[in-house]
UniProtKB/Swiss-Prot annotation:
PROSITE patterns: TBOX_1, TBOX_2, TBOX_3
Lineage: Eukaryota, Metazoa, Chordata, Craniata, Vertebrata
Presence of the UniProt keyword Metal-binding in the record: no
GO biological process terms held by the UniProt record: cell fate specification; heart morphogenesis; mesoderm formation; positive regulation of DNA-templated transcription; regulation of transcription by RNA polymerase II
PANTHER family: T-BOX PROTEIN-RELATED (PTHR11267), T-BOX TRANSCRIPTION FACTOR TBX19 (PTHR11267:SF114)
Gene: TBX19
GO MF term (any one): RNA polymerase II cis-regulatory region sequence-specific DNA binding
Name by which UniProt lists this protein: T-box transcription factor TBX19
Amino acid sequence: MADLGCKKPSDCTVSRLLSVVESELRAGRDKGDPTEKQLQVVLEDAPLWQRFREVTNEMIVTKNGRRMFPVLKISVSGLDPNAMYSFLLDFAPTDGHRWKYVNGEWVPAGKPEPPNHSCVYIHPDSPNFGAHWMKAAISFSKVKLTNKLNGSGQIMLNSLHKYEPQVHIVRVGGPHRMVMNCSFPETQFIAVTAYQNEEITALKIKYNPFAKAFLDAKERNHPKDAPEAASEGQHMTYSHSPQAPHGCERYSALRGHRAAPYPPSYMQRNHSPTVNFFESSSNNLQVFSGHDSWTLPSSPHANLLSVPHTKGATSPGPSHYPCLWPVSNSAVSVTNPGSEVNSNTSSMFLRGNVPLPTASSSVQIPLQATVSGGMETQGEAPLVRLADSAWTSSHSF
């Protein structure tokens, strides 16, 4: 304390606070002009605004209010550093038309609605010294646009009308005096309740880090565009199924399909007694694997399949992979034991959302042997074709 030359601790605290304020305002004071003759206002992010203007910018208006993007930001110089100013923002119609989007372009569509009493937005830092306004860019990021008059300080605009933001600088702290009104043609936009031009939607997604909410259902259901869009703006997320052990694509075109050929309720149901068929030289039987993008339970035998071997109703018991189509003893006949195995793996499982019969004794789908000796279900597409030269017509399930 002695080094600061303060007589009391409170004096030292005041001196420290005043020095902080002085250093904070020094940057703005260097840009000041007490006469205000060199007052200048510059639009920040002008190239971005220009890019939106080239395709006719659109701004969303909602009942609860929606913030603008791009955000209106300006830089000011030439204010009196020691004078007090307030910054205000309103929106003025740019023409006498109502607009509509037809065949990829905006065209006039009749007379505009009567002008409403739009609220004037006062920057939350107002009033403040000129040095404060000049030290950094002034952002109107909290402005909300609405299409309903709710009296909450939001800016009410008519949908399908074109507007241009206007910034007003008012000197306060004495007799109020309007110092400057300024606007920028690059910031013109059409108020809409939903984006009409897909190019505008793409630009919003590309440059706005909070644009995930702008994605519509069509874009969410077309993942082929996801990698490109995600590389442009890292804020986008797509829902996808966990990666299967057989290497499913990250953004699969079958996102709405289940990962396994049967629902979990069927996967967990047990049946007994069973006869296990798998690839082996001892019984010369082959069971074809499912599609490599389906997730199957892990097992010591990758191609293991269980088929009920019973004349009556099935009873609970352990099973690796339950058979959903019980085979009755009277429904199977084998006429040609010398057939060859049909290795058409594409007919192993049904990939559509078809209802599956429950595994009970009251529902049975008979199997009928064809001339070639293969076994196939009646009515639906063939699920499994089995043939074995070691089996004879006298053998029954």
